[in-house]
Amino acid sequence: MKKLTILGSTGSIGTSTLEIVAAHPDRFQVIALTAGSNLELLKQQVEVFRPRLVSVLTADLARQLDRMLSDPKPEIHHGIPGLIAAATAGEADVVVAAIVGAAGLVPTAAAIKAGKDVALANKETLVTAGRIMMDLVRENGVRLYPVDSEHSAVFQSLEGQSGKDVKRIILTASGGPFLNLPLDRLSRVSVADALNHPNWSMGQKITIDSATMMNKGLEVIEARWLFDTPAERIAVNIHPQSIIHSMVEYVDGCVMAQLGVPDMKAPIAYALTYPERIPTGVKPLDLTALSGLTFLAPDYQRFPALKLAYDALAAGESMPAVMNAANEVAVEAFLKGKIGFTGIATSIARTMDAHEPHTLATIEDVLSSDLWAREKSRELIGLS
């Protein structure tokens, strides 16, 4: 039986992970859960899965949760120390890192240092601190299993192959809700429009990132570290049907691809059970029902955020961390109606222009760059 800690259990990835656990009680046991402020859902999860430890955002929320739960209660923690306690819980074999944004960096690093294998759904961990994190993975002899559908597809397409035989990695992207919208209308799209993803059901932040294609940019940077592949050998193709989740092209001209209906339970389950596979309840793919599979090159005029991600990766050092933090601030500002949709990429670019890249040697260096970028981005947007 595999014992799990789930960081971010009330989010989209966390709830899907627990659906898999519930479907296979003979294979999985939940040791620890963490959440932000969704106490009602966390309470339900605690009652069903009976973790030994839980953690929430603040001390006040921890007190509220304690009042909501009946005996026997788990240990209740809060804040960064609580996340670290969950990530390093002794019994856990695998830590599912599903916290959104840079907040997932510290607990994920703690899990790796504690010798835990990590099912990584938090792409910002490698975006902001890729070199540091991969060094930690090697030093501690643990495995990092990708949960993102695209990286899971690449991982599966690389199975049994030698890295020297890979010509390039091709990440696919749906193009989001604005793929065919006239460019002059992009500045006027609403939050509701941007949250209406055509294929995937996800949290708000990643859905906006998909609309700008920053999500794909983050995945390019993540792929650079996960698969030790330079940016010039990582391509992006827009594939509106989201059936082919990514591809690997080999030097002999052959291309290996992973296909399936858009459902995150499939890559989550593979990360949890590798190298085995288990039933997930995912709808079977019926190729005869498809009218066709189409592919397009990304248009940087429509999706400038993707170009910014490639630029950040080329600049290296602290720039990806700065870009990521600026994006988080800009997306939050858009969701709150403070800036327009096209203002997201503009704000990120201005923050990057104001930054001089420098070496990141420690997690603390990453967090310092992250903080600088958040403050600068808020200043440029006019939020501070």
Curated annotation (Swiss-Prot):
InterPro entries named in the record: DXP_reductoisomerase, DXP_reductoisomerase_C, DXP_reductoisomerase_N, DXPR_C, DXPR_C_sf, NAD(P)-bd_dom_sf
Gene3D superfamilies linked to this entry: 1.10.1740.10, NAD(P)-binding Rossmann-like Domain (3.40.50.720)
Binding positions (NADPH): 10-13, 36, 38, 122, 124, 203
EC number(s) recorded for this UniProt protein: 1.1.1.267
Coiled coil: none
Pathway: Isoprenoid biosynthesis; isopentenyl diphosphate biosynthesis via DXP pathway; isopentenyl diphosphate from 1-deoxy-D-xylulose 5-phosphate: step 1/6
Annotated binding of Mn(2+), by residue: 148, 150, 219
Example of a GO MF term: 1-deoxy-D-xylulose-5-phosphate reductoisomerase activity
Domain of life: Bacteria
Binding positions (1-deoxy-D-xylulose 5-phosphate): 123, 149-150, 174, 197, 210, 215-216, 219
Catalysed conversion reaction: 2-C-methyl-D-erythritol 4-phosphate + NADP(+) = 1-deoxy-D-xylulose 5-phosphate + NADPH + H(+)
Pfam families membership: DXP_redisom_C (PF08436), DXP_reductoisom (PF02670), DXPR_C (PF13288)
Protein name per Swiss-Prot or TrEMBL: 1-deoxy-D-xylulose 5-phosphate reductoisomerase
Record gene name: dxr
